[in-house]
Structures are given as structure tokens and as C-alpha cells.
């Protein structure tokens, strides 16, 4: 009490001397006062005072983290001269709430539970220099804290992050690292997606084939993807590791759909009896666990029994999403089940399946979470709904009395683009910038006042179809997870400009901790290939206003010049938060963003100076294109000049047949002319392998994953006919079949708002 009174008196006196400063903490605390004129210094007189047994793991972790970068070995003692006191305060109404007092000669962290104390220590760590996150000792650093009082508690009890090790396997070391970092920002649930069509990653001792067969898949080109799995002992270790950091692991076993890896191992649990193969492509599989086979539910119970022995979490996630029911419609056992249970549709059969699985979980002492499709066939009041197809599932669930967790795909799917798809790595097709995440409100207005407390919180999801490794996973998670952490934790504070300022310091922490976070890329160019006649103005900016450079060229003689004094190339050592450039000769412009000594990926745009718009060819009157097809698997177009074509014919346009099978791959070359109606600059895009116009290869997707029209070209074309060559490669590239996207060429003038697809009337021969 004397210490608290002294603190109050010091703050009152200092208010006359200095304005209170902010703290660069994410998420923003509920309430705090800070003054830097007096400080607590870590030294040999510092120690950790921890008298409650349940806090000992938290204290030991804090001591370990402090030692790595400071070299100080803080003892855990009953008393010392400069104590850091950790204490659980049972009077706090929220178990995750904390109060942090920092004096010149003591620190006190009071939490509603061990998790609350841990969160208080994370705020303390963020008040130290960013170098506190380094793994090696940093000499010459001022390891001190400003005197402060911080009072804080969470808005939502469920603050989740989802990871998917089933499309591309993520090693346990990566998952542990994410537990470390998400907990630093007070996220408290790790949703671990353990099974899917493409891989089974949970060891089930009663069914060893699940991991013997379900962890590898044979690709169309004959290569084998060998993933991995987690042993039960490894996962028990992960659970304990996360518990100390205030994180609960919520495991997910997908059913009745997304189960091809399981059916490949145990085909007797499918409607047809197999044979099945682990799915080699992404997307939705039509085969499901058989709802009419009682042995399936014993299979599920056996798996869930072993799962719950590993994971002590209150909730178990059972999936339930994306279940096309055609296979059930054709299955005699499923139809018999429907008749027996008085069910009229397969959607109701899906509801029966989910409710029966929930009964198994209740017998095991657990509660069920499912994706929002579980609402469609009827769900019990005790089920918790994870709303991913927008807000509607969460609204319906909450208003009918079910608990819900909000994770709408347009705001919470971190596998979506966070910058321009022209230059960012391949991602799912949505666009989710940092500011959109920060601006999200998790409780929709359509939820009635009496049901608003049914929203437990929210969650970020990272599906790994286009996440090849752990490094890229971090690139997609951070810093968007920091924005979400503030949305889910901060009670009544939201200021994006202030968040961006705090983010600068936190990004330095990520750098020190070896986290591969996303830096924004320069934006402004509309294409990777741009034609011009005299000169072209280029304005580059980025979403966080960080410095940018353009490499290798800096004068008009070299092709690119600055439009304002003081903006130059990297060699000149000058950067700008907005670059205004003038391109006067053909040149390859490379530019990037830099922050804290770290550079973003480099974007490249080729500016091609032409004397005049490409002249049109002679008048043509016959529609159509010449097509050649060669059968076989072509990883890229390198060998195309030496191919003997199997088919040569005449077609009206680019041909698309959804029934084409990627299991019998082939490559096609279309040649002819395209007609444009006026002389103009035309923006052209396609997901084809290659596109040539007037003998210039303007788009090259050879050997790349092709979707989302990420390659564009801006050409100057004269009114009339222009030669065209298009290459379409019907193969699977990293799980994505080319024929999931129509072989289209899209075009528009600079003035037009929307692209149009070139069709039969546009092509000539």
C-alpha cells in the first residue's frame, strides 16, 4: 500500500513537469499513466518475487526471456532490493485482467490468473527496448522501464489464430514459435487444423494407417509430397508449452467432409468402399464419411477419445464445412438412415451426423465447435458456431441462442492478398489489407442486445494451399495479427493512425525476434510491362508510408529520372515516402520499401519506349484461331519449340471444357489475330501460360501457379488486327489445376472501368 501511495504522489508531482507519454504497446491497454522522468533499472539487485506455486512457470519463462538479451540472471526469491512481484489477485473479475505497477525500485504485476500475470509481463516487455526480443546478449543497451501504472482487461474471451499443416506441412518448431508470438499480443487460442483431404497429421494409435498413408500424396506429374505428422507426445508437449503462455490449443478433426486422407487409409468408412487416394489438388472433395454406417461413428469416437486424451481444451472443433451430399444421395446406407430417422434431405442428414458426433464429445466431457454449415441441418443449443461465410452464420447462431466465434472470410482469412496481386506472392483471391483488419467490428448490428454476449470473440485463419513453408506463413500472419489482437482485446480504443505509429516499434521487435513479417510493397504501376511513346509518369507509394528506393538507375540518361529534388537511387542513399518518377527511355524499374534496415521484396516493371502504337496488320475477314495440342505433362514451356503436336485444328475462340481431366495433361498453342476497335493503350491480362501480341511476349506465367490474373501488360495498339499467340497448359501446378480457370484473355482501355473477355467475334485468321 505504501508503494502504491508513493507512486500516486510521484505521478501527481510529475504532471506539473512533463506531459504523460504514450507507450508503444499492442494491443492498446484499457487505461495507463506513464512518465519517463523516473525509471526502474534492471540490474544485479533485481529479482522476481513469486510466492504462488501456479505462477512459477510464468516466472521462470520471464527470467529466461530477460536473460537471453540482457545477460541478467534474475533470481526467483522471496524478497530482494528491487523486486518484480508476480501475484494472482482473486478479486479481479476477469481471469485475464492485469494491473502493472512500475516504480523506481519495484515492479508489481497483479493478474486475475496466471494468464493475467503473463499478459501483464508481455506489456512490461513491450515497454522495454525492442532488442529485448533478441536471442543473444545485446551490450550497451539501457534496460529500464518508465514509472507507470497500467490497468487492462480483454473485450473478448476467445482471441484465436488458426493454422493449417495439412496442405503444406508446418513443423512443430514453427507452431511453437507462433504460440510465442501470438501470446505476446494477448491472443489466447490456437486452432490447430489437424486433418483434411490432403493430409492427416494427428497420430491415432488405434488406426496407424491414418499417418502411414494419410501423410503423403502422389502428384499428377508422379512426384510424391511427403508431409509429416505430430505424435501424441509432441502435441502434449505443445499443450503444456502453450499453457504457460496463456494459449489453449483447440484441435480440429474434419468430418464428415474433408476426409479423403482418412478414407484413403480406411476405405470401409466411405460410402463406396473405395479405393480412395489422398487428394492431390485443393478444393472440395465429393467423398464423405458414410452417415449410414454405424461403424463410422465408432471410428470417430475412437479418434476423439485419443484426441481428448492429448488436448484438455474445453472445445473440440469437428469441422462440418463444405460437404456436397451427392454421394449420400446415391448411397443405400445413407438413404436407409434418412428413412429410419425421418429425414427428408441430405442436409438434414448432415445435421444428424453433426449432432451424433456432438453426443460423443459430451460423453467425453467436451463441447463442440463447427463451421457455420452445421447450422444448415439443425444444431443443438450447446453447439458453438464458427462463422466463416460472412457474418450471417454468427448472426443466426447468436440470435437463436448459440455461442459463436466470428471469422468472416473477407476480414479474417489471412491467406488473402495484403497488397497488390500484381506483385505480392500468390494468395487466395480476396484482398485483406492491414487497415481493413483493424477496422473490423466483430459483433454485427443485426445481433439483438440480449444476445450480443453470445459472440465469444474472433479468429484469424491461415489456410496453407498457397503457403509453401513456415517463413511464408509468418509473412501472411504479421502484422495483420497485431491489428486483430487490438480489435479483440481493446475494450473501447480504436485509432488506426496511432496503431501505425506503435506498429513501427513493434515491427522492430519482430525484426529482433526473427519474425518474417510483411513489409508493404511499392504500389502504383498497373502492369508489369508498360509501353509508352514520349515519356511516362510513375508515382510510387506504399500503405504504411515507409521509405522507398528504386535501384540501379537515377538519371534521365539511364532512362529514369526524379520529378522532385532529393529522390534518387539506392546508391545515392536517399529515400522517399512517395516517389514521383519520369521514364523517358526503355528501362527496367526496380523498387522496394525499406524499414529498420530491412527491405521488402522488389517489384519490377519493364517500361518499353516505342516510336508509335503497334501498326495493324492487313484486313482479315475470317473469324477463328489455329489450335495445336500436344499430350503429356509440361512443367513449363521451355521445350515447346521441339514438341510434335498431336492435334491441329481451327476453333472459334479459346476452348474450355470443364470435363477435361488434369490427370491426362496436355498443352495447347493458339495462333491468329485479335481485332481492336480504336487506337489506344490497352491493358491486357490472362492466366494462360504465355501470351504474345505482335510477336512480343507480354505475359509469361511459364512454370508458375496461374490464377487471379496477376500478370498484366499495357500496350499501345493501332485500330485493326494484331497477331496473337496464346499457350494454355492443362496441368496441375502445386495443387491447382489450370482448368479451374477458363482460358480467357481480358482486355480494356485505360479509360474503361472493367475488363471484357475476348470471344469468338474478336479473333481472326
Located regions from the model:
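Acidic/polar, compositionally biased interaction segments
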Residues: 240-243, 248, 610-765
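Short, solvent-exposed S/T- and G/P-enriched segments that are highly enriched in secreted/extracellular
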Residues: 535, 552-554, 559-561, 573-587, ...
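Acidic, contiguous N-terminal accessory segments
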Residues: 20-157, 367-371, 375, 379, ...
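Append "Rare intracellular matches occur via the same short Y/T/C beta-strand/loop motifs
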Residues: 550, 581, 587-597, 722-724
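Active-site neighborhood of glycoside hydrolase catalytic domains
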Residues: 277-280, 284-381, 388-396
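Feature activates predominantly on carbohydrate-active enzymes
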Residues: 26, 93-315, 331, 356, ...
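Flexible, acidic glycine-rich loops studded with aromatic residues
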Residues: 368-373, 378-383, 389-534
Amino acid at each position: 500500500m505504501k508503494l502504491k501511495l508513493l507512486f500516486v504522489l510521484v505521478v501527481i508531482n510529475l504532471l506539473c513537469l512533463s506531459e504523460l507519454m504514450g507507450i508503444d504497446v499492442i494491443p492498446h491497454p484499457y487505461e495507463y499513466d506513464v512518465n519517463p522522468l523516473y525509471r526502474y533499472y534492471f540490474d544485479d539487485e533485481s529479482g522476481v518475487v513469486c510466492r504462488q506455486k501456479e505462477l512459477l512457470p510464468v516466472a521462470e519463462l520471464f527470467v529466461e526471456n530477460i536473460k537471453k538479451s540482457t545477460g541478467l540472471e534474475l533470481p526467483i526469491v522471496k524478497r530482494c532490493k528491487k523486486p518484480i512481484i508476480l501475484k494472482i489477485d482473486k478479486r479481479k473479475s476477469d481471469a485475464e485482467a492485469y494491473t502493472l505497477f512500475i516504480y523506481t525500485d519495484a515492479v508489481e504485476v497483479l493478474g486475475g490468473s496466471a494468464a493475467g500475470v503473463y499478459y501483464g509481463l508481455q506489456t512490461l516487455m513491450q515497454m522495454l527496448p525492442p532488442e529485448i526480443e533478441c536471442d543473444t546478449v545485446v551490450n550497451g543497451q539501457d534496460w529500464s522501464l518508465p514509472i507507470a501504472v497500467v490497468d487492462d482487461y480483454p473485450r473478448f474471451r476467445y482471441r484465436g489464430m488458426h493454422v493449417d499443416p495439412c496442405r503444406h506441412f508446418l513443423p512443430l518448431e514453427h507452431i511453437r514459435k507462433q504460440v510465442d508470438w501470438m501470446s505476446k499480443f494477448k491472443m489466447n487460442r490456437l486452432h490447430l487444423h489437424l486433418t483434411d483431404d490432403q493430409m492427416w497429421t494427428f497420430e491415432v494409435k488405434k488406426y496407424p494407417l491414418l499417418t502411414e498413408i494419410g501423410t503423403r500424396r502422389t502428384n499428377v506429374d508422379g512426384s510424391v509430397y511427403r508431409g509429416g505428422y505430430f505424435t501424441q507426445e509432441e502435441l502434449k508437449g505443445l499443450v503444456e508449452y502453450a499453457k504457460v503462455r496463456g494459449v489453449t490449443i483447440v484441435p480440429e478433426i474434419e468430418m464428415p467432409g474433408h476426409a479423403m486422407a482418412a478414407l484413403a487409409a480406411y476405405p470401409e468408412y466411405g460410402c463406396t468402399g473405395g479405393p480412395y487416394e489422398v487428394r492431390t489438388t485443393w478444393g472440395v472433395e465429393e467423398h464423405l464419411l458414410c452417415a449410414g454406417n454405424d461403424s463410422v461413428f465408432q471410428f470417430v469416437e475412437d479418434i476423439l477419445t485419443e484426441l481428448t486424451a492429448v488436448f484438455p481444451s474445453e472445445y473440440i472443433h469437428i469441422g462440418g464445412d463444405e460437404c456436397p451430399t451427392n454421394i449420400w444421395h446415391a448411397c443405400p446406407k445413407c438413404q436407409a438412415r434418412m428413412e429410419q430417422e425421418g429425414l427428408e434431405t441430405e442436409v438434414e442428414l448432415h445435421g444428424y451426423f453433426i449432432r451424433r458426433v456432438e453426443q460423443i464429445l459430451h460423453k467425453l466431457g467436451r463441447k463442440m465447435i463447427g463451421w457455420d454449415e452445421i447450422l444448415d441441418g439443425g444444431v443443438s443449443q450447446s453447439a458453438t458456431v464458427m462463422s466463416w461465410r460472412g457474418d450471417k452464420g454468427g448472426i443466426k447462431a447468436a440470435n437463436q441462442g448459440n455461442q459463436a466465434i466470428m471469422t468472416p472470410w473477407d476480414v479474417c482469412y489471412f491467406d488473402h492478398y495484403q497488397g497488390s496481386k500484381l506483385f505480392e506472392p500468390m494468395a487466395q483471391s480476396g484482398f485483406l489489407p492491414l487497415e481493413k483488419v483493424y477496422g473490423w467490428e466483430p459483433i454485427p448490428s443485426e445481433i439483438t442486445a440480449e444476445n450480443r454476449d453470445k459472440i465469444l470473440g474472433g479468429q484469424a485463419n491461415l489456410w496453407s494451399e498457397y503457403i509453401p513453408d513456415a517463413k511464408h506463413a509468418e509473412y501472411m500472419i504479421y502484422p495483420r495479427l497485431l491489428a486483430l489482437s487490438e480489435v479483440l482485446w481493446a475494450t473501447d480504443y480504436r485509432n488506426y493512425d496511432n496503431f501505425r505509429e506503435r506498429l513501427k516499434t513493434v515491427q522492430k521487435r519482430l525484426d529482433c525476434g526473427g519474425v518474417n513479417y510483411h513489409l508493404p510493397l511499392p504500389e502504383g504501376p498497373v502492369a508489369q510491362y508498360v509501353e509508352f511513346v514520349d515519356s511516362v509518369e510513375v508515382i510510387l507509394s506504399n500503405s504504411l508510408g515507409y521509405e522507398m528506393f528504386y535501384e540501379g538507375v537515377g538519371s534521365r540518361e539511364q532512362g529514369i529520372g526524379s520529378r522532385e529534388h532529393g529522390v534518387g537511387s539506392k546508391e545515392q542513399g536517399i529515400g522517399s515516402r512517395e516517389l514521383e518518377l519520369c521514364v523517358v527511355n526503355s528501362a527496367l524499374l526496380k523498387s522496394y520499401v525499406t524499414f529498420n534496415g530491412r527491405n521488402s521484396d522488389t517489384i519490377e516493371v519493364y517500361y518499353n519506349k516505342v516510336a508509335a502504337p503497334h501498326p495493324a496488320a492487313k484486313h482479315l475477314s475470317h473469324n477463328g484461331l489455329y489450335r495445336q495440342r500436344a499430350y503429356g505433362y509440361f512443367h513449363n514451356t521451355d521445350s515447346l519449340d521441339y514438341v510434335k503436336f498431336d492435334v491441329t485444328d481451327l476453333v472459334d475462340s479459346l476452348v474450355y471444357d470443364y470435363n477435361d481431366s488434369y490427370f491426362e495433361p496436355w498443352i495447347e498453342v493458339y495462333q491468329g489475330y485479335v481485332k481492336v476497335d480504336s487506337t489506344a493503350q490497352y491493358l491486357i491480362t490472362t492466366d494462360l501460360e504465355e501470351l504474345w501480341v505482335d510477336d512480343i511476349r507480354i505475359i509469361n506465367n511459364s512454370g508458375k501457379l496461374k490464377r487471379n490474373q496477376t500478370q498484366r501488360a499495357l500496350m499501345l495498339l493501332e485500330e485493326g488486327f494484331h497477331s496473337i499467340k496464346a499457350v494454355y497448359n492443362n496441368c496441375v501446378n502445386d495443387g491447382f489445376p489450370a482448368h479451374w480457370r477458363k482460358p480467357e484473355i481480358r482486355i480494356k482501355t485505360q479509360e474503361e472501368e472493367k475488363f471484357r473477355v475476348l470471344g469468338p467475334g474478336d479473333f481472326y485468321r
